[in-house]
Amino acid sequence: MKFAIETINLHVYYGRNHVLRGINLQIPQRGIFAIMGPSGCGKSTLLRTFNRLIELNQDARVEGEVRIFGKNIYSEDVDPIEVRKKVGMVFQYPNPFPHLTIYENVAIGVKLNKLVKSQKELDERVRWALKKAALWEEVKDRLNDYPGNLSGGQRQRLVIARVLAMKPDILLMDEPTANIDPVGTAKIEELLLELKTDYTIVLVTHSPAQAARIADYVAFLYLGKLIEVGPTRKVFENPEHELTEKYVTGALG
């Protein structure tokens, strides 16, 4: 079986700080895979290795392999820009470009990478991405407005639309609902459940409850080590490790 993402003996250092320690992980194609663990355990660092965004930190050093659909993305012949086209990223804080309209926010990556040949194709791509992100009906009459008037949840769905417009294979989500109200969170969780049939979604979450609600598989990290990984129900109801049990029951934060 060819996994969407596979790490082999993955180590990450920030200077002398050994942040990830020998991570061996296999993430299946399609579905939602949640990475959970207490603050500072290495969740976001691990996520950033999956599209080489980690390399934007000059102090970071990566050892081992990260394979995307079987190809080691840290090979010398791999362009990180090309990796990021296929492995999209959504961050914790909704970050639409404030100086661009709603339409332009979705269109910008498509235009810069020349993914369409005409204005008509661009219009269709923007509409498709906004529909895919469950935002079209809310913004279709104000595409030329700026995103400042959108709610936090709407801004995050706009960012998701911007990523989807690039037609990636994998979506990386770094605590995408951490700064969004419960109503906005519920809409984004519902959206992810719809998207998982077409995409591999890797979700970093600070909330075991969120992982239990929407993830098909979960991985538990602690102090830079992969403690346990498996189907969500099994990990929550019958964990193999005491640390995992403490975390999912709230005894370890």
Curated annotation (Swiss-Prot):
Top-level EC class: translocase
> Does the record's keyword annotation contain Nucleotide-binding?
yes
Q: Where in the cell is it found?
A: Cell membrane
Which GO BP terms apply?
phosphate ion transmembrane transport
Molecular function (GO) terms listed? ATP binding; ATP hydrolysis activity; ATPase-coupled phosphate ion transmembrane transporter activity
Q: Where is the ABC transporter domain?
A: 5-248
- Provide the primary localization: membrane
Description of how the protein assembles with itself and partners: The complex is composed of two ATP-binding proteins (PstB), two transmembrane proteins (PstC and PstA) and a solute-binding protein (PstS).
Q: Which family does it belong to?
A: Belongs to the ABC transporter superfamily. Phosphate importer (TC 3.A.1.7) family.
- Described purpose of this protein according to its UniProt entry: Part of the ABC transporter complex PstSACB involved in phosphate import. Responsible for energy coupling to the transport system.
Give the protein name, as stated in the record.
Answer: Phosphate import ATP-binding protein PstB
Q: Upper lineage ranks? A: Archaea, Methanobacteriati, Methanobacteriota, Thermococci, Thermococcales
